[in-house]
Amino acid sequence: MEYNAKNIEYKWQQIWKKNGYSEPKDDYSLPKKYILSMFPYPSGRLHMGHVRNYSIGDALSRYYRNRGYNVLQPIGFDSFGMPAENAAIKHKIHPKIWTYDNIDYMTKELDALGFSFSKKRLFATSDPLYTRWEQEFFIRMYEKGLVYRKSAVVNWCENDQTVLANEQVEDGKCWRCGHEVIQKEMPGYYLKITDYANELLECLKDLEGKWPNQVLTMQENWIGKSYGLEFEFKFDSSSKILLDGMDGFKVFTTRPDTIYGVSYAAIAPEHIVVKKLLEKNILDDATSAKLKFILNQSPKQRQSIDKDGVSLGLNVIHPLTNELIPVWCANFVLAEYGGGAVMSVPAHDERDFEFASKFNLNIKQIIKSDTLPYCEKSGVYINSELINGLAYEEAREKIISKFEKEGWGNRVTNYKLRDWGISRQRYWGAPIPMIHCKKCGVVPENISNLPVKLPDDVVITGEGNPLDKHSEFKNCKCPKCGSQATRETDTMDTFFESSWYFARFASDEKTWEDVAFDKKSVDYWMSVDQYIGGIEHAILHLLYARFFQKALRDLGYLRDCEPFDSLLTQGMVLKDGSKMSKSKGNTVDPDDIINKFGADTARLFILFAAPPQKELEWNDSAVEGAFKFINRLYDRSDNAYKTEILPQINHSNLNKDEKYARLKVYEALKKSTDVFENSFAFNTLIAACMEALNGLNAQNNKDIWTEGYFIILNLLEPIIPHACHELSNELFGLKNFTKLSLKDEVFVKDSLNLAITVNGKRRSEIEVSAFESDDKILEIAKQEVSKWIEGKEILKEIYVPNKLVNLVIKG
């Protein structure tokens, strides 16, 4: 048969579309598999990272369909976000038009690759129907106390009049206009993800062995649970006077055992003490200028530069020794962790040591060591009256107990995890369904009025939020009292959309207008059996999605605690050693590969070039090699005959080459189960199929050719579906796309080829019966290498079953 990729692929894509091949069945009695690859942003064109992601997911989906599973593999578009606004400015086009034009084009690209996505469940997160339910979730969370409004310091571009994410601040300047970014306090909405901090952490245990350890560790560190002592540093009398009688401030430490080594207290630039000092204008000009300079740096900037700070001219009293401790403002102290203040022990903390060394502050050693800083939780305590000579755990407990007994402090649990700020001063996002009324305050929109839709008649300039200037959108009636009011003009962080899309996919599309989730279908499909996406989403997206699953469970929308049962993080696609990017000029357009070689070639190369978890280096010659293999597969089709069942073969009557050919075919079949259900090492399965095809080539038995071809097409169908469907349809009526069984007799070897080594050096090889005794094998081996051992004393005779014989001789 001749291989014409373009014609064959178009033919089968139309057949699959017509017969609903990709659509899940409504029969909920069937075993199910929900395979989901992270949905794309509609940037305009697919890139090779997309092709890799979706090739993996589609291979798994087809494998399980062939084995009788009800499979859901949906696709959609994460379509809100800044790139659409940037395109609107650059190309003078409305973000909505740009977005949906891109969705149309990328959908055609996905179709051309033969991915078996459920098209009935396709949606974009910017669709009004999706926004409608998203806004309902927001309101229900608000009613439950999971959403609140507060003022916080944000990155602000005065020129563009907008808040910037940390990633959009480059060297202290706006990534888009280059204007200096300042820190500005602004009101915004926050989700109380911290209410779920402990559950998010504890449930990671349920994902062990099913999620990559790296991802679990990253999430654990991001949540950052820590145990310690919280107490109050009291100001001395002169400091109290400066601060209008303020008594002191709370600090949190995970190392109460080192409290005798405190030589200064450090507070964050945003701390109330700093604010009071600046408001009272009692600091000298240099100190005030330094504080304002640090305040205008984003938290991310502060963490990436050298330790810096300024003395505030205040003192607190050490609770145990009554010594006066100087108070400093330091750029390394986080405002939102532990109250924004720390006790600093430079002898036993690297960060504190660096700061103290820079500013010549006292360094007091309280654990014996030859070098400083010594940060281990072990050693002999010195200069510590209550705990001298104690071990770490005992010392820690004694200090905490002392503080609790005296009423100075308490043992507490802290988390690094912060509440999630979702307010964005953007147009192209889901409107926050809140209304500002002079009589009622801030109130949610009525559910019956959802969705709050974006107005189309806006002009995107990049300066400020267009919604804030749109009077028709902004002016409204209060849903509570009917008075004139104003609508919230901030839109939601786009992570909000991607935090629940997987559950929407699981809901029967026929119910989408009536309910957020159809309970029967969602309970059947959720949780996602296999989730696939890049490691770059390990923290934010995956953590927010896990939070949403739990919050929506508690609101009565969903049942399960975790959204994704198993996670595969695929590596990047590289070219010339670097990640593909337009700026580097090293991109490869999937359309070009499809037009030249076909979709199956692209898919075969992607899955053969490297294990999915590893980075993949693009190689043009390897792409051509994949194309040649598919052609070779076609060329060999004439060696098989038409049948809809496997030929019946008497294995004992076969010659050596025939048995070897069958063995290689069934070894590939045996490997396939682990590859598709566990390791995802598609490259090893493809290599096994290539080896099996070579084994078939080395013999002429038509029955064995037919059996082998029948099985090889079954194994390769998830990887190169168009070619395999065409060949199978011609030869086997597609009857081979089902679960196939192993045949035990194939794996029984009649003979063994054993290497013989003398003192570790290979000298010869023998072929013996697979049923020969060990003693007989050793006897045959010694005869074979007699000229190397004659007259020598044999010290050891070692037989490694099925592999080799090693003889150790003296001299």
From Swiss-Prot:
Q: SUPFAM superfamilies per the record?
A: Anticodon-binding domain of a subclass of class I aminoacyl-tRNA synthetases, Nucleotidylyl transferase, ValRS/IleRS/LeuRS editing domain
Q: Does the keyword Nucleotide-binding apply?
A: yes
Give residue numbers for sequence motif 'KMSKS' region: 579-583
InterPro entries the record matches:
aa-tRNA-synth_I_CS (IPR001412), Leu-tRNA-ligase (IPR002302), Leu_tRNA-synth_edit (IPR025709), Methionyl/Leucyl_tRNA_Synth (IPR015413), Rossmann-like_a/b/a_fold (IPR014729), tRNAsynth_Ia_anticodon-bd (IPR009080), Val/Leu/Ile-tRNA-synth_edit (IPR009008)
| GO BP, sorted A to Z | leucyl-tRNA aminoacylation
Q: What is its EC number?
A: 6.1.1.4
Q: Where is this motif: 'HIGH' region?
A: 40-50
PROSITE patterns hit by this protein: AA_TRNA_LIGASE_I
Query: What coarse category fits the chief subcellular location reported for this protein?
Result: cytoplasm
Q: Which family does it belong to?
A: Belongs to the class-I aminoacyl-tRNA synthetase family.
Q: Which HAMAP family match?
A: Leu_tRNA_synth_B (MF_00049_B)
Q: Which NCBIfam families match?
A: leuS_bact
Protein name (Swiss-Prot/TrEMBL): Leucine--tRNA ligase
